[in-house]
Design a protein with these regions (language model features):
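Extracytoplasmic copper-binding redox domains, predominantly the cupredoxin/blue-copper superfamily
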Residues: 2-9, 15-16, 23-116
């Protein structure tokens, strides 16, 4: 029994070392934004490449999350609906609500230097 426990402990230790030494194998952190009172919060979100951003509509009426360049576009999100998009390329992504075009915000994607 001790031999089996020893193998399990060794395996877990190896896994931990692999995760620590190979940060590119670890997924980029996810980020969240909300839609409330005709506003995207935060208005400017900075993330690393590989990050998935999830927007949640906390307003009482539908909204969309639409990239100015049409790179991403949600359907109309009712209250508590979500939309997610993974940003793989560094850059600045301006977006708006297609139902209320004065609602605007930006996602800034920085290079994920840990992945190199």
């Amino acid at each position: 029994m001790r031999s089996r426990d020893s193998r399990v402990s060794t395996g877990l230790a190896c896994l931990l070392v692999a995760v620590v030494l190979c940060p590119s194998a670890v997924r980029a952190e996810d980020a969240t934004a909300k839609i409330d009172i005709f506003t995207f919060v935060p208005a400017r979100l900075t993330v690393k490449a590989g990050t998935t951003v999830t927007w949640r509509n906390e307003d009482d009426i539908p909204h969309t999350v639409t990239s100015v360049t049409q790179r991403f576009k949600s359907r109309a999100l009712d209250t508590d609906d979500t939309f997610s998009f993974t940003f793989t390329e560094p850059g600045t992504y301006d977006y708006f609500c297609s139902l209320h075009p004065r609602m605007t915000a930006t996602v800034v994607v920085e290079p994920d230097n840990a992945a190199k």
